[in-house]
Amino acid sequence: MDFSTMQVVVGFLKTSMGLQSIRDIVQKAKVDEKDKTLLHIHLCFFHANEMARDLNEGMDVSQIHSSAAIKYRAAIVTRHVKMNVETGGYDRKRMVEYNNETCVNWFSCEFKEEKEESQELPVDEDCVEEIVENFLENCGISDQNDQISTTSNANYAFGQGLYEYATRVSDAIVAVISGSIKKGIDEFLDKVYAAMSQIFAAWMPKIRAAFQWFENIKEVVKNWARTMHEKINCILVGMEDCLYMGAGLVAATCIVTLLEKFMVVTKILPAPCGAATLFLTTAMATISAAYVCTKAVEKSVMLTNVLHFVTTNCQIVLNALFNHDATKKELGANQNEGEAPTGVGQFGISTMLQDVANLMSTWSTNSVTEIGRTFGAISQIKNGILALRDMVYFVFEKLSDLAHKVLGFESQVLADLTILLGENVADWLSECDCMVSYMLEFNSRNREIFDRLSQLIEKGRLIRTGVLRTGHRGSSQVMALVTKALEKLIELHNSVVMSGSNTTRKAPFMVFFTGASGTGKTSVVQRVAINWLQEEQLGTNEIYSRNGQDPFWSGYKRHAVVTYDDFGAVPGTTSNEAEIINVISRNPYATVMAGLAEKGMYFDSRLVLASRNFLAANPESGVHDSEAYERRRHAVIRVSLKPGVPYNADDPCANQTYTLLDSKTPFREIQTFETYAELWSYLYTSFKEHEVQEELYLKSLPILDSDKKEALEGLVGLTVIATSFAPKAVMQYGMEKFPGHHFLVSDGEKCYFWHGDGSVESASVEQMQLSKQDVAQLKQQGLSTAMMYKDLAKAFPTLNSLAVLYAKNIVVKRWVGPDLEPTKTCEDVYMREQIGNLPKWQRAYLYVLSKYLTTQSPRGWFMECLEETKKNLRATYLWEYKQWPLPLKLALGSLIAIMAGGAIWYSLQSLWCMSGDASFVAGAATVFSVSSFAGQSDIPNRDNSERSFRNRKVRARTWQGQSSCFGDSALWIAETCMATLTFSNVRTQVCLAPGRGFFGVNHCLAAIPAGVMVKMDSSIGVTYFVWGKEKLLQFDGNEIALYMTSTLPKTVDSLLGRIHFDVETLPKTFSAVFFSYKYDPMIQQMVPELGSVTCKVHNKAYTLAHGEYRREIPQSLSYEASTVAGDCGSLILAEIEGKFKLVGMHVAFNGREGSASFMPYHASLDQKVGQGDFMLKYQEWAEPKILGPGCRAMGLIDPEHALAASGKTTFVETPEEWHLDYPCDKLPSVLARGDPRLAGTVHADYDPFASGMSKYAKEAGPFDAASLKQVCSGIVEIWEDASADFPMDEVDLDTAINGLENVEFFDALVLGTSEGFPYRLDRGPGDKGKSRYVSGESGSLKITDEGVLSDIAWFEEVSKTQVPDLYCIECVKDERLPIRKVLHEPKSRLFTVLPMSYNIVIRKKFLNFVRFFMKRRDVLTAQVGINPYSREWTRMANKLLSKGNNILCCDYSRFDGFLPKCIMNEIGNMIARLMKTDEVSRTQIKNLMLACTSRYAMCNRVLYRVENGIPSGFPLTVIVNSILNEILVKYAYWHCFEDNPSVQSNFDAHVSMVVYGDDNLISVSDAISSRFDGNFLVSFMEGLGIKVTDGIDKTKVGIEFRRLENCDFLKRSFKMSPDGTWRSPMSKESLWPQLHFVKAKKLEMAEAYINNCNNILRELWLHDVKEAEEFRNKVLRNLRWIGHEQLLNMQQLAVFHSEQMNGVSDFLSTCVTVDSIPLMDPLVPGMLPVKTSEIIPRVFVAAEKHFEGNFNDFFTISITTSRKFEEDKGFVLLFPYGAGRGGLPTTQFMRENVIRKGCSIQKKFRQAYEKGNNILFISQSSVVPSYVFAVMLLHSIGAISRLSSNKALTQAMQTCKRLEYLPKEYEEFF
């Protein structure tokens, strides 16, 4: 028989035992008197069997208990007595056998009947106990040895003992209710204890020996019940017995269950036998029989429902604490092995109330009750407090409905309890009293106090609303209580509202919304404000809408939120922008108020929301420093509409997109939010972070001292304000009766007046004969005025500390009376003396505060109101309570026990989790302590006492009495993974996943409703985000789910290696560590716990149940451990292959075993391959050294694979006389740790490898994908235009090795360089790099090594589908560095050697692309392959000057290290698009390029994993770096002009740029130079994590425009030659170190030195021929061992540079200017002049922006610039611009108005020129238009020849390409 059936039939037995009809039949039976007791027991069993037969025939419970059924069965019993008993057919022996058979069948289905000897039963009814004892003896209990004789007997005995125990408990309950027990609860508990002792008599010696607390069990249960009553603030005064009985019944059930477990653990019982179920059913059956069936038959069905409710309450507690239901189902499953077992999700004790509500919803067909929301909304845990409140409402509403049917009238008690408990009124009132105490203790003007008052008021309003919405309204006294408390709160709120902080405050958080009209900015502002108020639990009346036109802050009452609509649209007296500078500040800001009564208001709102169409400040705002305004906007959000998405009134934000912008110019994009939920998550998280920072700042400030003078000034100021509040009659009375006095304060009955000498006078209201209106006004303002005086005293704490430190005690204890003298309640003599010494004005306000805020009792004002309400209701309650039937009292008691006994149930739960008799006994002694029950259930943490987790001591779980192994590796996993997810008041454990996400238990995460605010608390920090159910990834057959979202912080990359995904590789059985980190409600903090478990891989499916949630789990990990509620999400850590890994997460418990699901794998977590067949041997560290997200040191390489790096430089220092007195600011770099040059300095331990790898710590970003694609697409279009004649296909292996002869940029593979890894391991003595792997003649070399060929094929094949891994060798670069980078701040650079096979594959794939890229540098931005000695340098200079002479020279920090994968992926797409490849080849190209950004780096023996950057040994490094450089600048440009598409899409029209690797020069036209400048680049790049400095002066802050001749490129400058070409001299600082250090590896030092001298000569020749000649002479003069023939002479240098410049042409053959040399000077080819210049004598050209002369000195022709001239001083030339004509007018205009003979313009010019005036042609941005006008007018009047105009206009065309139309349209000038 299963337990549920047993529960029913035992109930039948107890019902039978209580029937009066059976007693009557026994009395009438014709049997001996001594046999009547036995007959009564027999007939009860017989009647119970008849009830069971009715049940089997299909009758329901109500039919079985109906009057008709009872009468029918009574007739059957009567017939049985007549026919069988009285006739002798059933003698004493037969009746005992019948009874025994029934007990055997019911109490144990495994019990086999044993033959018993016949024995005489007692004949006296007083010997019933003896019958029981004999019965127990017959069932196998031996008093001599306290042992169980047989297993079957043990179960039988235990079951029967519990049967009797339950009977006695039930009898005691009935006795209490019936009044037979006069001493009440004590006697009731005494009888329960006696019954327990008698029934468990056989085991009492063991129980008493193990549990000394057993003797005190009565006091323990009383203490528990008393604690529960206090928890609900003693609302049940006079009705406590229902709580004591209900709590006693629930507690007794738990104790029985715990004792059963103890007996199983100690082997007294072989297995659990369902003691709790048996006890509950028999107890309820007894009550039912004794009360329902005898006293209330007509309502038996309803009362049976109530008793069933009581039983279920007890079972709910058992299930929540001990997973009792799971144990029962498991035992049932053992009988039916075909069914899958069930595990229970351990989500928390909060589900108990939900289970109660679910039960009550089945009481009637109308199971959905409207209580503000349907009960169906409660079926899943949702918004914490609201959900619990709704469930309490629902449960009490149902109980009230049933009580109405039972009582016949509506229960006022239950209706009031619905409100008092459902709305938690007592806790609200207690919080109000705490608030008053806090206000007295601290400055009541604080924003925190003000907000807390607002929260309490909002909560009170919600309570009042809840009272009105209930179906059972409750008493008027309860409604009056809520109203009275709410009015007092509002009075308190008003008393502090006219104030604020006049000291340093928290700066409010400002959110600025911008966007086009009609995008819905205002609706977003309103929604953000409402959501913020909801999260902060404030009412909607806390929003203040600021009117920008109002010079006053009319209506401002320190609202929490201030909104500005159309911010600054119409400037007022003070603009919104100017106002914000003071509002968003930490300085106090006094608002300008209209009325005198409102003076003294200070702004201290917490959130400011503004919306406006424009980003920048209004030009008329009066803000001179725009940055001061812009930086006050903490978040700038641009609102835009999603194309094609219509407006939805139900969700106004559904069609909006939000873009986070930088608050400062140029307002670059930072992040885009596609949904409002994502935006709200970001804003609320940012707000919380802002609040934390502001609090830290305020805590750092010192307490300011003050003096008496300031205090008196403040007092006078307050009296002025108080005077303005007081009625005129009061002021008049004070002037007449108390001249020289000021009105101080009033308590509503007396008024106090203060004099400057400190005296205080008083007068009663009756004396002043005030009207009722004046008295009301005094009462209304009294508290407010007193609070202001109190705050004044708090502001001057050093003057009178007593008024500050003891203000609370003085007020609360009423130590000051109305006469302002100490009262009798202040018994301390010293304190009375101190109070008497207080100034009278302080005593006055302290008295008034006590009058308003306290009562005569020691309780607070609000709790005293509750006490008064309880007193008024007590008589009504007691009258009603007497009418209640027993089941209803038990129902209420057990329900409140569930709600109020949380700490007790947690204590019992912790006791259940203990294993072993020793730990169980020790834990029970603590839990059942009479003095305290809370916080005592922890096991002493011995084995791990030295362990800590997040600064908390790790608590051990010793389930099997063994210590837990928890090494540093496992601790690192827990520290990295463990996180707490909090939604509303629910906390659950989750595990951070690689990337941006976390693993969690599905039955927990799936219950979170979409759209709620969720908090993630981990080692990374706290993040708030809005829950999106669509982001929850679920896995078939696995209870662990994965949640991925971009709003979470990114975890460390190394986490992936510590998670074990492969279930098949796990052993069938293995040891593991169970680690949890969850909230302990008893100690009110997070507690880390761990324990050892033995895991088994369980391949049998089971069903996981959690509330209504059901899911079948086919495979899991199981372990014997008594886990508890809240353990779901705990980590299962196991040692796999020598190191700890995460193998699973705990998800369920079935009453005996815990269950965990395996970690699910998802493709988004990782993708991993290796390098060919080679496996690098290394020892991985348990805790990798994290340099940053992009780089971590993983471990040590085994010696057999390690490569030793040489620490010796190849540079040799030359003798001092060879230095020739030239300076040297460079030294050879530091190549290894322990460099002797650093000995004794702070850098003595400098490691160049660790320092060099740090550049890879973090990648740049984030980048906007759409913008990045646009920029890259534009670059590829230029490539495609330039690549028409270039093949782009892949070359064969021979070409990749040998190159192509006579084809530029198709060089052969360099064989002398390193071969890379792992080939470097095979290098023998004398071997040279790659050369040993090839054979053949030069030009026809072939690879002969099969291993290299195999690796080449492997790279080509694998890269088609995946990114191959690389093993790279890091070497310190042996170079000369500035002294500061060697001695002062060592900074050596690393060179990366890649595998030879990989490099060859790269050459095969990209050689044609490289040739194109270098060959077409004439049109491309990148100048890779440029010859600085050739005319290319001039071409490059001209290209830059084509946009003007505003040039930016930038220098990047960590350029090699920050290349992100997203850009490398785009570069791969760009190359693939140019090569026109198919999809497979495109993937192969990208994977090959991404391989170098995700590689293993070998630094000596340390192995690093690098996830970004580009290695220097990559064949395409300089090309990729050049592309990256170009992308970054164009990406910045794109975002700079995103508000101007026409400029944004025309980069080349406004900017000319050249790049070479990380070097760049950016020439910006005048038209955009004010916006796209160095400051913008620095700021924008900083937002991407990139540091950019000035390329010339790296110590300079910011980047300024330079002229070309002041820039450098590739360490070379620009110098103009006389012939108009540009030279590229290298900086001299880079030349002289060649004289100090030489590389003498191949040559002797002298030969190397001479080579260096010749290099210097070549470079000096570019500076100046004379300098080169002087240097040559100095070398020959000082170093006579050098012959003159060894150094290049001037002629040889000239020939060299001529050949470099012109190929075969003579460099000295220069063009001779044919005419008018001065005319040519201003316009150098490629240069856009802006400086005022004289082109021929007396004729000047100038640009408007750069002209600094005096117009009075010239006859001015002003071209399109508005200016007035006198007739003889010039004129303005206005004309319509021609499209694409370089700033010149149309041809028709020029011919008719400029060059036509005799035209007005020409005539005026001729006259001025012939008069000898200085003539000035001035145009706007450059001199080009004025230059062309001047040349044409000079030629038209014959001042210059046609040849001169030809030359001049040709050079103008070279400067401005748009003038190319001139020869065609103006042939006469050419």
UniProtKB/Swiss-Prot annotation:
Modification type O-(5'-phospho-RNA)-serine: residues: S937
Transmembrane segments: 910-930
Enzyme Commission no: 3.6.4.-, 3.4.22.-, 2.7.7.48
Residues under site feature: Cleavage: Q346, F347, Q936, S937, Q962, S963, Q1171, G1172
Keywords, comma-separated and alphabetical: ATP-binding, Covalent protein-RNA linkage, Helicase, Host cytoplasm, Host endoplasmic reticulum, Host membrane, Hydrolase, Membrane, Nucleotide-binding, Nucleotidyltransferase, Phosphoprotein, Protease, RNA-directed RNA polymerase, Thiol protease, Transferase, Transmembrane, Transmembrane helix, Viral RNA replication
Signal peptide: none
Active site: H1003 (for picornain 3c-like protease activity), E1039 (for picornain 3c-like protease activity), C1128 (for picornain 3c-like protease activity)
Catalytic activity: RNA(n) + a ribonucleoside 5'-triphosphate = RNA(n+1) + diphosphate
Sample GO molecular function, one term: RNA helicase activity
Gene3D superfamilies: 1.20.960.20, 3.30.70.270, Trypsin-like serine proteases (2.40.10.10)
Residue intervals of the SF3 helicase domain: 486-654
GO cellular component: host cell endoplasmic reticulum; host cell membrane; host cell perinuclear region of cytoplasm; membrane
SUPFAM superfamilies the UniProt entry points to: DNA/RNA polymerases (SSF56672), Trypsin-like serine proteases (SSF50494)
GO BP terms in the entry: DNA-templated transcription; proteolysis; viral RNA genome replication
Domain Peptidase C3: 963-1165
Binding residues annotated for ATP, in chain numbering: G515, A516, S517, G518, T519, G520, K521, T522
InterPro entries linked to this entry: DNA/RNA_pol_sf, Helic/Pol/Pept_Calicivir-typ, Helicase_SF3_ssDNA/RNA_vir, Helicase_SF3_ssRNA_vir, PCV_3C_PRO, Peptidase_C3A/C3B_picornavir, Peptidase_S1_PA, Peptidase_S1_PA_chymotrypsin
Pfam name, any one: Peptidase_C3
Stretches assigned to the RdRp catalytic domain: 1445-1572
Name of the protein in its database record: RNA1 polyprotein
Source organism of this protein record: Broad bean wilt virus 2
